[in-house]
Amino acid sequence: GSEMCIRDRLLAVVAFYLAFECLDWLSTRRIPFSEARFGRVWRVAHAVLSRHPFAGPFLVLMIAWAPTLIASLPGLFMGDTGAQIRQWFNYPNGTSDYLRLLNPNVLLNGHHPVVHTAIIGSCVQLGLSVFNSANAGLAIYTCAQFVITAACMAYSISSLRKFGVSMPVRGVALLFFAFMPMFSNYAALLTKDVFFADAFLVLLVQTVKLVACGLPRRDANAERVGEPRPVLFARHDWLLLVLGALGSTFLRNGGLVFPLAACVIAAAFCAWDAHAAHRAAKQDSAASTLRVPRLRWVGILAVLALCLVSNLSLIHI
């Protein structure tokens, strides 16, 4: 036992040493990733990561994760999964046995996020109604979660391009997500944590986008001359910010703290951008540069107010 422990520790130390040596070697001997040098490999990577920055990674993830989905159907259960399903159908479950319920005849409670319990319970109910099979309902939920998780991961990779991250780094990130079994297994896991992680990832990306709007940007996106520079925060990004904030709020008990922190941080940066734009407008006698940071600041406060009001409404229900 002790010999195996010592061996494992030595192997871990050697592995960390070799990993950092490899990183040092890559930093000193950087090979430019260009079309002239790599030809077909560069064109494939460019098509997947730059010409189709969202659809390309999304298809790669769906194809790479498909064997896990097929092997896992109707889904991988956690300890809480059965309890949530039984709650939705008002059957006795592990939480109803020890919680002091407001109404003993209503076993649905807030031990698990009620919104997620409603989602997975509704899918099972749909499977029973349409296909007369609870497994069919679980498969519907698993497939929907699988697609949404792949879409969120693909969106995070596509957003790296807007942040000026080079194509090789985005390619390595995509391959890591595609072939690390943890992510494909997680996408087929029937638990409340998966949808929350998806929503939190979108919220995190949108918050970084808002913060980065006022920062100088590296122009590392144009792999070919004449390519348009991507817009960092477009109109549809507000919808994604709302979805990420609401998802983080309702898919985790106490999850309101995450959009609260994100909106406060983003609002502080946007307020600073508005202050800087106001000073620049005084010097240049132009008010147009002041309008955009102020609108972003107001939009962030509106998203925060929406999360607060909707959370209070759910509590009263």
Q: Where do the protein language model's features map onto the residues?
A:
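Transmembrane-helix signature of polytopic, membrane-embedded enzymes
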Residues: H52-G56, S156-F179, A197-D198
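Transmembrane-helix motifs of polytopic, lipid-linked glycan transferases
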Residues: I140-G164, V202
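Conserved small/polar residues in nucleotide/adenosyl-binding loops
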Residues: E3-R9, H316-I317
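Multi-pass, polyprenyl lipid-linked donor-dependent membrane glycosyltransferases
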Residues: M78-G82, Y141-A144, V172-T207, G247-V264
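Membrane-proximal lumenal/periplasmic loop motifs of glycosylation machinery
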Residues: T68-M78, F89-T149, L189
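Specific aromatic-rich, kink-prone transmembrane helix
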Residues: F89, Y155, F195-R218, A245, ...
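Membrane-interface alpha helices of multi-pass inner-membrane proteins
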Residues: D237-N253, A302-S310
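Juxtamembrane membrane-water interface segments immediately following transmembrane helices
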Residues: T68, S72-F89, P293-I315
